[in-house]
Amino acid sequence: MYSIVAEESGLLPRERLLQKGAEVLSDQELLAIVLRTGTRSESVLSMANRILKGMTSLADLSRLSLNELQKIPGIGRVKSIELKAMVELAKRIEKAELARSEQIMSSQQVARRMMLDIGDKPQEHLVAIYLDTQNRIIQQKTVFIGGVRRSIAEPREILHYACHLMATSLIVVHNHPSGEAYPSRNDIDFTQKIKRSCDDLGICLLDHLIVGKSTYYSFREEREDFEL
C-alpha cells in the first residue's frame, strides 16, 4: 500500500481536518481521506483530483455502480466498496435529517426527500407516506415495486395500511425510471381512483407525486384544487 506524500507547502488532509475541521477541506482533500492510499506512481491527492476532474459534479459519484467505480484507474474492489458505502451513508444521513420530527409542510419538501429515496431506482417504486392529524409522518411504506405484469399498485393495498395505522391523511409517491416526471394517462387514472377511495373512507389524499432523479411533478401543485 502506498500512502500520501505530504507537500512541503501544506499539511496532510487528515492533519488539516484535525486542526481546522472537516468543513474547510476541499472536495479533493475529503475524497483523498476516503481513498486513504494512492498507487506506486500516483499520490492519493493526485488520484482524488483526477477522479473529480472526470466528473461534472460530486453527485456523479452516487450514480456510478461498483463495476463503473472499479474501471477508474487506481480504484480496485475494496476502494469501490468503500466509496459506495460512503455515498449510501451520506444519502441516509440526509434522509434522516429530513425525517427528524418532521411535519410535512409542502409537496416540495416531500419531493426532495423522495428524489433521494427512489428517484434513481431502475424499477417503478410506489411509496405511501401516512400522516397523523398534525401532518407528522407515522410511517413511510413501499407498497409496490413494478414488475412485468403490473406497473402500479391498487388503492386497497395503500388504504389497508392507512386504516391499520389510523392515518388521517396520506401522500402517494412513485418514480419514473426514465427520469421524466410528467404524468402518463395511467398515472392520472390511478390518481383519480385513489382519491375517490380515500374520500370514501374519510382519509385525505394530500398529493400524488411523481419523481425522477432531479425533478418532480405534484398533482396538487399542477392541478387546481386537486381536481382531476
From Swiss-Prot:
<dbReference type="Pfam" id="PF04002">
    <property type="entry name" value="RadC"/>
</dbReference>
<dbReference type="InterPro" id="IPR001405">
    <property type="entry name" value="UPF0758"/>
</dbReference>
<keyword id="KW-0482">Metalloprotease</keyword>
<feature type="binding site">
    <location>
        <position position="187"/>
    </location>
    <ligand>
        <name>Zn(2+)</name>
    </ligand>
</feature>
<feature type="binding site">
    <location>
        <position position="176"/>
    </location>
    <ligand>
        <name>Zn(2+)</name>
    </ligand>
</feature>
<keyword id="KW-0862">Zinc</keyword>
<dbReference type="Pfam" id="PF20582">
    <property type="entry name" value="UPF0758_N"/>
</dbReference>
<dbReference type="GO" id="GO:0006508">
    <property type="term" value="P:proteolysis"/>
</dbReference>
<feature type="binding site">
    <location>
        <position position="174"/>
    </location>
    <ligand>
        <name>Zn(2+)</name>
    </ligand>
</feature>
<keyword id="KW-0645">Protease</keyword>
<dbReference type="InterPro" id="IPR020891">
    <property type="entry name" value="UPF0758_CS"/>
</dbReference>
<feature type="short sequence motif" description="JAMM motif">
    <location>
        <begin position="174"/>
        <end position="187"/>
    </location>
</feature>
<dbReference type="InterPro" id="IPR046778">
    <property type="entry name" value="UPF0758_N"/>
</dbReference>
<comment type="similarity">
    <text>Belongs to the UPF0758 family.</text>
</comment>
<keyword id="KW-0378">Hydrolase</keyword>
<dbReference type="InterPro" id="IPR010994">
    <property type="entry name" value="RuvA_2-like"/>
</dbReference>
<dbReference type="GO" id="GO:0046872">
    <property type="term" value="F:metal ion binding"/>
</dbReference>
<dbReference type="GO" id="GO:0008237">
    <property type="term" value="F:metallopeptidase activity"/>
</dbReference>
<dbReference type="InterPro" id="IPR025657">
    <property type="entry name" value="RadC_JAB"/>
</dbReference>
<protein>
    <recommendedName>
        <fullName>UPF0758 protein STER_1430</fullName>
    </recommendedName>
</protein>
<dbReference type="InterPro" id="IPR037518">
    <property type="entry name" value="MPN"/>
</dbReference>
<feature type="domain" description="MPN">
    <location>
        <begin position="103"/>
        <end position="225"/>
    </location>
</feature>
<keyword id="KW-0479">Metal-binding</keyword>
